[in-house]
Amino acid sequence: MLDANKLQQAVDQAYTQFHSLNGGQNADYIPFLANVPGQLAAVAIVTCDGNIYRAGDGDYRFALESISKVCTLALALEDVGPQAVQDKIGADPTGLPFNSVIALELHGGKPLSPLVNAGAIATTSLINAENIEQRWQRILHIQQQLAGEQVALSDEVNQSEQTTNFHNRAIAWLLYSAGYLYCDAMEACDVYTRQCSTLINTVELATLGATLAAGGVNPLTHKRVLQADNVPYILAEMMMEGLYGRSGDWAYRVGLPGKSGVGGGILAVVPGVMGIAAFSPPLDEEGNSVRGQKMVASVANQLGYNVFKG
């Protein structure tokens, strides 16, 4: 049994120690994100038996951004299976920035990882759908099933993203020309941009992690969202590429599958036990929340969780 007092203590200590840490800056290339108050911070745990522990601004809703890639990967695995995902997208770190075009050129147009922009756009195109709206609604629904029904598209974030996503449009056309996109290029890019533009809070993000930790069953709704056999593939990708250029460092120091987003959210999964999430907008140069990394790592360390430890 998990000790409730110990879990709340871990969350409180992580928040107290790091919520006002200096360093980093908001993502400034997306206007909406640049204007989020930089002092916001939160950390939360959701356990596999549905208990919630939290500190800070846990109700504040922020843009899901790249963490959405985890949800779309999960849906693609459900739709086409792990072998097709590996064959058509890949399962290897690129070793380059998350929005790299060079990574595509170096590997014949294959995106390699579903957790970088090129791979995520290609993953969006793998979703079974007859048209753009069905593709979008299925992706939104999986986000809601994994994290909570309150997850919804922000028109303001989406507009901010759609007017600045020229780089991703270029990536989509490169994928299409290389034969690694499985629907219309601009449809894939549009839906990908929408999936990044949903709003979530820190408790819901921890719920997403707890659903993965529980083998695909949401511990708050008690509904099975994913086949248990698909979850290890998601966690493997998160370990390899979840924190962009910091992924290796994260695995080395923290030892948990994780995923970050430029909206300031960060998620970690303790398989069979819990999801840990944090939020704070200022980012490091790789696009990861400075305070969020510290808070999640602190909780994991205090509780002794690391998948590489016996």
Question: PLM features: residue spans?
Answer:
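A short, well-structured edge-of-sheet supersecondary motif
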Residues: 19-55, 265-268
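Structured C-terminal helix/loop/strand segments within mature extracytoplasmic catalytic/sensor domains
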Residues: 215-310
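Active-site SXXK
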Residues: 49-50, 63-86, 208, 276
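A charged amphipathic helix-loop-strand protein-protein interaction module that recurs
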Residues: 12-15, 19, 67-78, 228-248
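A short acidic/small-residue loop/turn micro-motif
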Residues: 59-61
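Active-site-adjacent helix/loop patches that line small-molecule binding or acyl-intermediate pockets
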Residues: 2-23, 76-195
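Short Gly/Pro-enriched turn/cap motifs at secondary-structure boundaries
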Residues: 33-36, 112-113, 163, 255-259
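Penicillin-binding protein/beta-lactamase superfamily catalytic region
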Residues: 133, 162-165, 173-233, 284-289
